[in-house]
From Swiss-Prot:
Family (UniProt): Belongs to the NAD(P)-dependent epimerase/dehydratase family. HldD subfamily.
NCBIfam families in the cross-refs: heptose_epim, PRK11150.1
Protein name: ADP-L-glycero-D-manno-heptose-6-epimerase
Gene behind the chain: hldD
Record pathway: Nucleotide-sugar biosynthesis; ADP-L-glycero-beta-D-manno-heptose biosynthesis; ADP-L-glycero-beta-D-manno-heptose from D-glycero-beta-D-manno-heptose 7-phosphate: step 4/4
Length: 309
């Protein structure tokens, strides 16, 4: 059996899709379906069982067995960069992750988990997986950073696989439940389908991020599991492309050409990553050599999926 925490969420459900594509269906999904709309991410997938995240944690801490587990993909977390309840964030993203990690170590189960590029904070260069480059801007980024630091202490002595992925700006299918935290591509598509003029922040040609397609993210997760590599790795494309490029790709799909530029919100100033670009040196050195979709390629594929579903 494979366990995917956050399996009804964005990246988790895409990992399940990738597993299904390999004929793997003996999957336990762990999540919180209080937001019932997330069920839609699972309806076309094949899984063996579902468990609430709190029930899973209770069983885990009690040392209960779940049968033979081949791997745990730990994608479950609060991923809102605008959430400032630090206790909630640390309980969800730090303490919970420690419990799952120690269960995996005790049972020698491969543990693959979601870290984040938010660990780097507001820097504009050298996005490198090393302490001197890490200074998160928000409590979400801090929760991810602190767990990475915890993992670094354990990695040298670990007898089973531990691998963390610092996701950059992931976009693609199955993110609709995220609301305001969904990607710019998702929001532009919604606006275009509603007959609105799509909106971007002023200066969006200068805001550049490493936009990575979720199908590529799932592929990297599976490759590392299959190859047993441990460590903490950036997971982006290695390219920084502008929000304007995302909009251009969405407009091209919809055969439109007009955009409205709106003022940048005061509340985001100083708490916003204006530039991200993954350094893929360590990822490539680990042996992952497949290409990543460009914004033009990924957004076109995503637009086709959104307007088919």
């Amino acid at each position: 059996m494979i366990i995917v925490t956050g399996g009804a969420g964005f990246i988790g459900s895409n990992i399940i899709k990738a597993l299904n594509d390999k004929g793997i269906t003996d999957i336990l999904v762990v999540d919180n379906l209080k937001d019932g709309t997330k069920f839609a991410n699972l309806v076309d997938l094949n899984i063996a069982d579902y468990m609430d995240k709190e029930d899973f944690l209770i069983q885990l801490m009690a040392g209960e067995e779940f049968g033979e587990i081949e791997a745990i993909f730990h994608e479950g977390a609060c991923s809102s960069t605008t959430e400032w309840d630090g206790k909630y964030m640390m309980d969800n993203n730090y303490q919970y992750s420690k419990e799952v990690l120690h269960y995996c170590l005790e049972h020698e189960i491969p543990f693959l988990y979601a870290s984040s590029a938010a660990t780097y904070g507001g820097r504009t260069s050298d996005f490198i997986e090393s302490r001197e480059y890490e200074q998160p801007l928000n409590v979400y980024g801090y929760s991810k950073f602190l767990f990475d630091e915890y993992v670094r202490q354990i990695l040298p002595e670990a007898n089973s696989q531990i691998v963390g992925f610092r996701y950059f700006n992931v976009y693609g299918p199955r993110e609709g439940h995220k609301g305001s935290m969904a990607s710019v591509a998702f929001h532009l598509n919604t606006q275009l389908n509603n007959g609105e003029t799509p909106k971007l922040f002023e200066g969006s040609d200068g805001f550049k991020r490493d936009f990575v397609y979720v199908g590529d993210v799932a592929a990297v997760n599976l490759w590392f599991w299959e190859n047993g590599v441990s460590g903490i790795f950036n997971l982006g494309t290695g390219r920084a492309e502008s929000f304007q490029a995302v909009a251009d790709a969405a407009l091209a799909f919809h055969k439109k050409d007009s955009l409205e530029y709106i003022p940048f919100p005061e509340k985001l100033k100083g708490r916003y990553q204006a530039f991200t670009q993954a350094d893929l040196t360590n990822l490539r050195a680990a042996g992952y050599d497949k290409p990543f979709k460009t914004v033009a390629e990924g957004v076109a594929e995503y637009m086709a999926w959104l307007n088919r579903n």
